[in-house]
From Swiss-Prot:
Its EC number is 2.7.4.25. Belongs to the cytidylate kinase family. Type 1 subfamily. HAMAP family: Cytidyl_kinase_type1. The keyword Oxidoreductase does not apply. ATP binds at G10, P11, S12, G13, S14, G15, K16, G17, T18. Its main location: cytoplasm. GO terms for biological process: nucleobase-containing small molecule interconversion; pyrimidine nucleotide metabolic process. GO terms for cellular component: cytosol. The gene is cmk. The keyword RNA-binding does not apply. It catalyses: CMP + ATP = CDP + ADP; dCMP + ATP = dCDP + ADP. One of its GO terms (molecular function) is CMP kinase activity. It is an enzyme of class 2 (transferase). This is Cytidylate kinase.
């Protein structure tokens, strides 16, 4: 029996995570938040004082990637991320850990180490995977491929609201600069750069609500699954 796969790719702050969780809940599919994998690995390497010395400690970093124990659960259209059984959902969502993830993602050997971990999420009845290279590198066979984007300014505004909701005091100018820096790094990296798959359904969410984007996605996915 074929496992249905839905991929959602796009830049940081475009709403991928929220919409991936909603789609997984809607269809009763498993969920993969690939960005969380990189954030978790980045945080782990930081704690081990390896993140700033990736080249000389590469074998140890690769082993850490292979051994990561992570689980994703969906609850009320939200994602709960467990690391070694501990809920780290909020911990890994800071801008600092996002920078850790971007550094990890730029290392080909670490991307390779996480490749099979991501492929292992293919399980019946289906999978919703969100990230930056889900359709182009990890799940090219996906039946439904979505590329979700938004202007850097609108993504910065959303991120500020999210962080303020977590009780953090942040400046939109700092968040915008961070987003623009990550976009540049993600788009220019040599391995699996951020770009839409040639057959992806592209959505710009700059002026759309979550519910409006979700409905567009469901309409598209229903057609792909029926086909």
């Amino acid at each position: 029996m074929t496992v249905q796969i839905i991929t959602i790719d796009g830049p940081s702050g475009s709403g991928k995570g929220t919409l991936a969780a909603k789609l997984a809940n809607h269809y009763g599919f498993h969920l993969l938040d690939s960005g969380a994998l990189y954030r978790l690995l980045g945080l782990s390497l930081h704690h081990k004082n390896l993140l700033d010395d990736l080249d000389t400690c590469l074998s140890e970093c690769v082993e850490a990637a292979i051994q990561i124990n992570i689980k994703f659960e969906t609850k009320n259209d939200s994602t709960i991320i467990l690391l070694d059984g501990e809920d780290v959902t909020q911990t890994i969502r800071t801008e600092r850990v996002g920078e850790f993830a971007s550094k990890v993602a730029a290392v080909p050997e670490l991307r390779t180490a996480l490749f099979e971990r991501q492929r292992a999420f293919i399980q019946l009845p289906g999978l919703v995977a969100d990230g930056r290279d889900m359709a182009t590198a990890i799940f090219p066979e996906a039946q439904a491929k979505i590329y979700l984007t938004a202007s850097a300014e609108s993504r910065a505004e959303r991120r500020v609201k999210q962080l303020q909701g977590m009780g953090l005091d942040v400046k939109i100018s700092d968040i915008l600069a961070n987003i623009q820096s990550r976009d540049k790094r993600d788009m220019e990296r040599t391995v699996a750069p951020l770009r839409p798959a040639v057959d992806a359904y592209q959505i710009d969410s700059s002026n759309l609500s979550i519910d409006e984007v979700f409905q567009l996605m469901v309409n598209y996915v229903d057609q792909c699954i029926k086909a």
